[in-house]
């Protein structure tokens, strides 16, 4: 049985232990120590990483009563070794996990919803709640969670007897066999949990609910705590200041300024589209009435403009109109249409002679092709 030092002291960063066993595995070596401060994956939290005698530990898993450390190199059995966990990573995870307990406890107490899902990685922490919350209710929960941090109450760990457990009102997502570890944040939450937590709630720092979405009849919340919340604030502050500078707007007026720019952009896009269509009309006007076949090459056409130009030309009585956008270096996008004949044979020829791609219906085909303008024009002569 591996002694779990991460339960004895969640802030223990370095420890010594005896190597019980070390065997080769798929991606290195699998070692069991007499005791460990490395937390194995569990309870929605990833495993600790670090080093043992300078050898990298990339994963930790618990199997039965033993904890297996997965290393990039071999350890000598029977030797006393020194382990060091990646503390910044562990502390960040404890900040998130303890913060999640506070948020879940507050939601359960105020709205009666359960935490039905939890995931914690090195970027985000998400929790799934069994019922919906409005924007105002989320802000209420966030404010209450930070008030809890300010109170800086100690986190209490206990292992109640089965008799005591029956009388205890605690949160738990699953039925637990054997000894149950209870994490209590006085006044805010009582929950069964296997993960290490901070000593005092004040260590969590800022709790910020950054995103929410409807999920399986409830809500999924993305939250950041401590250093992660600080980093997020700093990044957003930089973005806000950049927008303020670009729009020459005060901080409290940037949303209004962005909306104004958005409206102006929409108007300009509309005016540009109208102008571009007028250019297409002028371009089509230059085509003689009733010309049987028209082949147009224009590198400036974009989006749906080739098709629009084709339709304008066909309205002039042209039997077949082919429009190519692009250039010889990067290739051409094309559209070919007719109101009087099947244009699919043209697409077939382009495929065969110019390694083209495309297809469509008898009245219109479109695709891409590589070749010279001169050679492609001969197809329509």
Regions found by a protein language model. Give the residues of each.
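A glycine- and charged-residue-rich anion-binding loop/surface
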Residues: 1-381
């Amino acid at each position: 049985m591996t002694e779990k030092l991460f339960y004895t002291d969640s802030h223990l960063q370095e420890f010594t232990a005896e190597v019980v066993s070390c065997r080769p595995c798929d991606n290195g070596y699998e070692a069991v120590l007499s005791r460990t401060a490395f937390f194995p994956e569990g309870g929605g939290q990833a495993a600790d990483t670090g080093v043992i005698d300078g050898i990298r530990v990339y994963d930790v898993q618990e199997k039965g009563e033993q904890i297996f450390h997965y290393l990039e190199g071999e350890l000598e059995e029977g030797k006393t070794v020194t382990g060091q966990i990646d503390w910044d990573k562990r502390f960040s995870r404890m900040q998130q996990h303890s913060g999640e307990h506070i948020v879940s406890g507050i939601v359960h107490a105020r709205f009666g919803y359960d935490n039905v899902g939890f995931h914690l990685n090195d970027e985000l922490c998400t929790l799934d709640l069994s019922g919906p919350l409005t924007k105002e209710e989320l802000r209420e929960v966030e404010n209450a969670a930070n008030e809890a941090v300010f109170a800086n109450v100690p986190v209490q760990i206990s292992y109640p007897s089965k008799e005591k457990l029956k009388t205890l009102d605690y949160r738990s997502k699953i039925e637990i066999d054997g000894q149950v570890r209870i994490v209590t944040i006085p006044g805010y939450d009582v929950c069964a949990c296997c993960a290490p937590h901070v000593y005092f709630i004040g260590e969590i720092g800022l709790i910020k609910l950054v995103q929410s979405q409807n999920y399986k009849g409830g809500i999924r919340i993305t939250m950041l705590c401590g250093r992660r919340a600080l980093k997020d604030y700093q990044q957003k502050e930089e973005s806000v200041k950049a927008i303020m500078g670009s729009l020459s707007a005060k901080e409290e007026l940037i949303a209004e300024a962005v909306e104004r720019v958005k409206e102006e952009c929409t108007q300009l896009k509309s005016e540009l589209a109208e102008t571009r269509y007028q250019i297409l009309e002028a371009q089509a006007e230059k085509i003689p009435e009733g010309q049987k076949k028209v082949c147009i090459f224009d590198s400036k056409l974009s989006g749906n403009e080739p098709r629009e130009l084709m339709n304008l030309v066909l309205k002039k009585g042209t039997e077949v109109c082919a429009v190519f956008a692009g250039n010889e270096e990067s290739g051409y996008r094309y559209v070919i249409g007719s109101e009087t004949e099947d244009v699919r044979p043209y697409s077939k020829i382009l495929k065969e002679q110019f390694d083209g791609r495309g297809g469509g219906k008898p009245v219109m085909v479109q695709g891409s092709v590589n070749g010279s303008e001169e050679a492609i024009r001969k197809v329509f002569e």
